[in-house]
């Protein structure tokens, strides 16, 4: 990897600033009830291309999936920075994970399908364009058809989930949209615009700790340290294990010279991070990039111990072993990665194993 970024606050689908769409100053905020509104031409397409012959639920779901990606339908393309409303996505034919989920849910409702948004609280993602590793939340949708549930996820192969997805309300999903826009405005140093958007997110879902933590970041960067501290503390009241709030409160304490408070926050943060496989993996990547292979191997092994079913952790450990000249250990770790996979991924691991064993 060429570079590494770990967000200091885990906004949903947090993007590296260079990858974010640049918001227009003074741009009007779309009302919450407009975020998932279907444009009339799109509604007509749903009825003419999906519902025209009154298909059954399974057929409707299959047609909807094809409609979203086929050139004769919407021809949607995944674009990481495309944080858009349903109407904007229809016009641009692009969507990120959040917008794709908003769009799918709106279309599923029009098609008479029972669909629900889901959230994975923490994921580890990798942006191939610039080698950036990032932490965030992730959303997708689940559909119930004939007693079975199907997951609809446009970027499932781009992430490493820590936890299983849990259902969330559509209100929270829409609040995430405003949170994402706030991050774009923050990256453009538009603090007033970011706070206005976070106000909407908080009005929709005041119990979501990450929004308060993000508001604390915006206030602190705008020079309002007292307001930022208040928001961070509120985030911790909602979620005592909110690592973003703890990290930023430790930073505030350090800047104000309160050493004892800084130590307290850093100890709390360290306790959480000791059982966090993503933190171990990030530390390992940092060490590997710095050329510290012994530490990288230790941290990769810790990540593997904490989340042993993640094949990419075993693969990364194998690569570190290989760089350290420990071929036998690399083969063992790669074999474990292979055993945890199937299909094309398993075949790719098999090729790598054959090449190593032939040395």
Feature annotation, model-predicted:
Residues 200-201, 234-235, 268-269, 302-303, ...:
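Canonical positions in the second alpha-helix
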Residues 206, 240, 274-275, 308, ...:
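Short coil turns that delineate tetratricopeptide repeat
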Residues 26-89:
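Secondary-structure boundary elements
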């Amino acid at each position: 990897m060429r570079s590494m970024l770990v967000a200091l606050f885990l906004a949903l689908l947090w993007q590296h600033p260079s990858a974010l769409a640049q918001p227009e100053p003074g741009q009007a905020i779309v009302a919450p009830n407009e975020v998932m509104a279907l444009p009339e031409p799109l509604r007509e397409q749903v009825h003419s291309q999906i519902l025209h012959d009154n298909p059954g639920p399974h057929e409707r779901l299959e047609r909807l999936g094809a409609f979203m990606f086929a050139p004769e339908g919407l021809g949607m393309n995944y674009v990481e920075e495309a944080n858009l409303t349903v109407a904007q996505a229809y016009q641009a034919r692009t969507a990120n994970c959040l917008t794709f989920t908003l769009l799918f849910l709106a279309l599923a409702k029009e098609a008479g399908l029972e669909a629900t948004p889901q959230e994975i609280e923490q994921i580890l993602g990798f942006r191939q364009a610039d080698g950036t590793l990032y932490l965030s939340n992730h959303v997708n949708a689940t559909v119930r058809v004939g007693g079975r549930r199907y997951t609809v996820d446009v970027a499932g192969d781009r992430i490493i989930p820590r936890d299983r997805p849990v259902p969330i309300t559509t209100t929270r999903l829409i609040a995430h949209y405003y949170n994402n826009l706030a991050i774009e405005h923050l990256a453009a140093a538009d603090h007033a615009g970011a706070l206005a958007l976070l106000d909407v997110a908080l009005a929709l879902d005041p119990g979501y700790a990450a929004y308060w933590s993000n508001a604390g970041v915006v206030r602190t960067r705008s020079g309002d340290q007292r307001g930022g501290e208040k928001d961070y503390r509120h985030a911790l009241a909602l979620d005592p294990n909110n690592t973003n709030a703890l990290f930023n409160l430790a930073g505030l304490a350090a800047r104000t010279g309160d050493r004892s408070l800084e130590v307290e926050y850093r100890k709390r943060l360290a306790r959480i991070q000791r059982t966090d496989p993503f933190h171990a993996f990030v530390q390992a990547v940092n060490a590997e990039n710095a050329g510290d292979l012994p530490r990288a191997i230790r941290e990769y092994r810790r990540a593997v111990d904490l989340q042993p079913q993640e094949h990419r952790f075993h693969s990364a450990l194998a690569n570190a072993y290989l760089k350290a000249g420990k071929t036998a250990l690399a083969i063992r770790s790669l074999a474990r990665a292979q055993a945890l996979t199937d299909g094309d991924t398993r075949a790719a691991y098999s090729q790598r194993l054959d090449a190593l064993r032939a040395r």
